[in-house]
Design a protein with these regions (language model features):
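Nucleotidyltransferase catalytic core that binds NTPs
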Residues: 16-230
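Cationic, low-complexity basic patches in intrinsically disordered or flexible, solvent-exposed regions
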Residues: 9
Length: 230
């Protein structure tokens, strides 16, 4: 990183005490680049939970190759993508850390900041099925609820140890997430779009224009997508 401060932390959302216990949902990823598939499921989760959703770009993801775009470039794309609305918010704290981005560290930090406010970690069905491979995965439930973004009619089969853990924590009513700060699991039926960031990068590298796979704001400044054209 170039030493610039990534100031977006999302503090101050919702003035007054009335909104204090609304859930805060967290949606992580490399966002390399941010595309309409990310935004669609994040927006629907925000509606289903009646929550703010923070998009949290990872610095060095432990389970995949490093992003092609730099942290500053990904932040610029996210800012452009999220302009004009207030329900989806950028939180770039993980980019300020050195080394791998471990979710447990982020949740610990957010819990210290948010007190008893319910936190909801949003995971795609495939990511959830791979949860036992995450660093200290069982401890995640000590700091947040987990919301699994599921495709209607499609069930991802988790391994036995995760299925057992999930069965004891599963709830069907979003209201149950507001009653406690952490520890529950809920499935959220969203409309996933089969959009591939890898394919988008390939198209851009070939000089193509994947206009309707990316948020419109990314085309307002040609420099935003330059990381994938060089």
């Amino acid at each position: 990183m170039d030493g610039a401060s990534f100031e977006e932390r999302g503090e101050g959302w919702g003035e007054g005490r009335v909104l204090a216990m609304k859930p805060l949902a967290l949606f992580g990823g490399t966002f390399d680049p941010i595309h309409i598939g990310h935004l669609t499921v994040a927006w629907e989760a925000a509606e289903l939970l009646d929550a703010e959703v923070r998009l949290m770009p990872a610095n060095v993801p432990p389970h995949r190759s490093p992003p092609l775009a730099t942290p500053a470039e990904r932040v610029a794309m996210l800012r452009a993508a999220l302009a004009g609305q207030s329900r989806l918010v950028l939180d770039a704290r993980e980019l300020e850390r050195d080394g791998p981005s471990y979710t447990i560290d982020t949740l610990r930090e957010l819990r210290a900041e948010q007190g008893e406010r319910p936190l909801v970690l949003l995971l795609g069905a495939d990511a959830f099925a791979g949860l036992p491979g995450w660093n200290r995965w069982r401890e995640l439930f000590d700091f947040a609820h987990v919301g699994v973004l599921s495709r209607p009619g499609v069930d991802a089969l988790p391994p036995a140890e995760l299925a057992e853990e999930a069965a004891a924590r599963r709830v069907d009513d979003v209201a149950a997430l507001r009653a406690e700060p952490c520890g529950k699991l809920i499935e959220l039926a969203v409309t996933p779009l089969e959009v591939s960031a890898t394919r988008i990068r390939e198209l851009l590298a070939a000089g193509r224009d994947p206009r309707y796979l990316l948020p419109a704001g990314l085309f307002d400044d040609a420099a935003l997508l330059q990381p994938y054209r060089r």
